[in-house]
Amino acid sequence: MSVAVPSRPRCPKSVLSIAGSDSSGGAGIQADIKTIEALGLYAQTAVTALTAQNTMGVAAVAGTEPSMVAAQIDAVFADIVPDAVKVGMIPSGDVARAVVDRLHAHGACNIVVDPVMVATSGAVLADEGAVSKELFGMAAVVTPNIPEAEVLLGRVARQECRIASEADAEHAAKALARHFGCAFLVKGGHGAHDANDVLATPEGDVCWLRAGRVDNPNTHGTGCTLSSAIACGLAQGLDMPSAVEDAKKYLDGCLRAHLDLGRGSGPLDHMWRFF
């Protein structure tokens, strides 16, 4: 029985992933590459950190020298200029400044920032200086989950913040978008019964993107996958709501495939369309 494999043009759109490496292959650069290629685009990378991790947790993190991160970004833009950029794990303020400097120098567009602060396992992956207002200000959209949005909003408001309802999520998205000057997608996947996300712009426009929650304990790399898929949509010229909606549909398929690997929170099936 033959399998219909989607085709792509000889000169596909490309997406640059600036993120950390995950030795288990489920998140970070590895998840980004799988997502971008599965969606028919060409993946390029700049590695910001090496992590020793598996489905049960993170054992060690080693940040890449900022000069090396900058050199990787320069090398990419000197040849195959990306149509979109996804920024994931930024381990330090120095790396954040290097990324901002080089993306600004190259006039990067369609930047999607996934503010990776804490791994699915609970391990802290970035210091406070890595949350860069300058980087967020360059972004087309920033994609925090609820815990990350609570941290970001707490820093803006200088007090502890909790998101416990859709009204709270909408308020957070609007406040963060206004403060940082870019769109914010607050992801509701941590909810018990649904995966409703809210997208807000600095101008105060709000769009809810609703979906049912997939009952699957294997969620390692969901944030990386969604943000990379959004970048793919933007690279292909979709408007923001359409790019997010398509990305959510792809992620839904990754979860519904129910790949079952590892002894902890396992990885997604990024290739569900092909098998």
Per-segment meaning from a language model:
Residues S2-C11, G28, H193-L209:
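Acidic-glycine-rich active-site phosphate/pyrophosphate-binding loop
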Residues Q30, T35, E150-V151, N216-M240:
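Short, small-residue alpha-helix embedded
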Residues L39-Q44, V206-C207, G233-A247:
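Phosphate-handling active-site elements
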Residues M68, D94-C109, S132, C182, ...:
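Nucleotide and nucleotide-moiety/phosphate-recognizing core
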Residues A126-V206:
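Conserved phosphate/ATP/ADP-binding segment of small-molecule kinases
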